[in-house]
Design a protein with these regions (language model features):
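Bacterial N-terminal signal peptides
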Residues: 19-29
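Bacterial N-terminal signal peptides that target proteins for export
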Residues: 4-20
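Signal peptide processing junction and immediate N-terminal pro/mature segment
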Residues: 31-35
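Short hydrophobic alpha-helices and adjacent helix-cap/hinge residues
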Residues: 36-327
Length: 327
């Protein structure tokens, strides 16, 4: 009887050890599974600490949180130099908003996945050349970009809908965009239109270049360029537009407020939505390769007072936006 009791106690102790071992193995399995799904750290670097930049960041975060779990966000302004360096080292993905923020991140060449958003294509190409030697080297190093330059086809389509008898199209290019003149010329001719293309340098007197084209154009379209070119030409473009009663299709909300008839542009919500979609692709390992992403979405705005001055009747906005952003 005593021997039977000893055997039973020994067997019980063995069973307890096996149960404990099984528990540890199961625990290790779950611990390993949890580690494989560790938190992804996304760092936002903004060029300016303003409401519009914060709005874009918050919208991106909302879109990501609606489909993703285990994502942590941090936000810094580009001028926080020491903090930016440390935050970039700890991040899994860096998202910059604005050319100033992109320059800070690209200049550090951290070897991290980087998405530069809210930036013109010309600004990105200049930074790629400066810090990586070429666009291809920057993309190969992990940089991708969401540019705000709306395709010219969208402005052409809008102009054709607003002006059914459209023929002569005045197009203004600057130093950053003049290389695209042959491509733009072809796009206009393919649409059955007559191009009147002018190129302005920083040393030119804008009115001397713009006036001859404006007076013979049915519509005038300035292509976004450097901040200096955009600012110095806008005043003359709008004054001559008023003088010759030629509608202007601009590239920003501010252009319309200042006196352009209309604009096709990337709104903060447009930028946020497309940027969030790309980030989600990266988080889900569904991002094929780094590239320059043209605007997927667009916003259209009219200045009804300018339309009245030009004697034009503007229809419901849906008439003009139908199929516009798909180009």
């Amino acid at each position: 009887m005593l021997r039977f009791k000893v055997i039973m106690q020994f067997a019980l102790r063995r069973l307890q050890k096996l149960s404990l071992l099984s528990f540890c193995l199961v625990s290790q399995f779950f611990c390993g599974h949890s580690f494989a799904n560790e938190t992804k750290n996304i760092l936002f670097i903004v060029s300016k600490d303003t409401a519009s930049y914060i709005q874009i960041v918050e919208s991106i975060k909302t879109n990501i949180n609606s489909t993703q779990e285990g994502v942590a966000f941090s936000l810094l302004q580009k001028d926080a130099q020491n903090r930016v360096q440390l935050a970039m080292e700890k991040s899994d993905l860096i998202v910059t908003l604005g050319s100033g923020a992109a320059e800070i991140a690209m200049g550090k060449k951290m070897g991290k996945k980087l998405i530069a958003s809210l930036i013109t294509e010309s600004a990105f190409l200049a930074l790629a050349e400066q810090y990586y030697g070429s666009k291809s080297e920057a993309l190969n190093a992990g940089a991708g970009v969401v540019v705000i330059d709306q395709p010219l086809q969208r402005s052409i389509k809008l102009a054709a809908k607003v002006l059914p008898d459209l023929n002569h199209v005045g197009l203004m290019l600057g130093p950053s965009s003049k290389a695209k003149a042959p491509n733009f010329d072809k796009q206009l001719r393919d649409a059955g239109l007559t191009p009147k293309i002018l190129s302005i340098a920083t040393t030119d007197n804008p009115i001397h270049k713009i006036d001859p084209v404006m007076k013979v154009a049915d519509v005038f379209i300035p292509v976004a360029d450097s901040h200096l070119i955009n600012v110095t030409t806008a005043k003359w473009i709008l004054q001559l537009s008023y003088k010759y009663r030629v509608p202007v299709i601009g590239f920003s909300n501010n252009y319309v407020d200042a006196g352009a008839l209309a604009a096709v542009y990337s709104s903060p919500d447009n930028v946020a939505e497309q940027t969030a979609e790309i980030i989600i692709e990266i988080l889900e390992d569904d991002y094929q390769n780094n590239k320059i992403h043209s605007p997927k979405y667009c916003t259209l705005k009219f200045n009804k007072n300018v339309a009245w001055h030009l004697g034009m009747k503007i229809r419901d906005e849906s008439y003009y936006t139908d199929g516009l952003c798909g180009l």
